[in-house]
């Protein structure tokens, strides 16, 4: 199965184009608290879990480098969600919506 991807450089444009998109950070809670993309919800990845997300929303998923978010997106798609992964993860994201803990 091909995993749909969004470029980290185009993520801000994508989110602006599709208002209401859900951004899901699948890293640990500790990693999320250190830094995350503004408006992202933190749902740590747990292989085989049943995702409980709004079915009518487009879902953008990211992790540290992209591998975990791709696995999560694969499972989300199998469960009927419209999801895509941020290529390269938060490591590659340089957009204006990056939030660091204070």
Task: List the model feature ranges, each with a label.
Residues 1-22, 28-58, 65-102:
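Rhodanese-like catalytic fold shared by cysteine-dependent sulfurtransferases
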């Amino acid at each position: 199965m091909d995993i749909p991807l969004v470029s980290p450089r185009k993520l801000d444009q994508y989110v602006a184009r599709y208002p209401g998109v859900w951004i899901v950070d699948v890293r640990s809670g500790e990693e999320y608290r250190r830094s995350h993309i503004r408006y992202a919800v933190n749902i740590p990845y747990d292989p085989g879990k049943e995702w409980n997300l709004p079915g009518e929303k487009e879902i953008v998923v990211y992790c540290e480098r992209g591998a975990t978010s791709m696995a999560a997106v694969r499972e989300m798609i199998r469960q009927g969600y419209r999801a895509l992964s941020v290529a390269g993860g938060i490591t590659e994201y340089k957009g204006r919506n990056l939030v660091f803990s204070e």
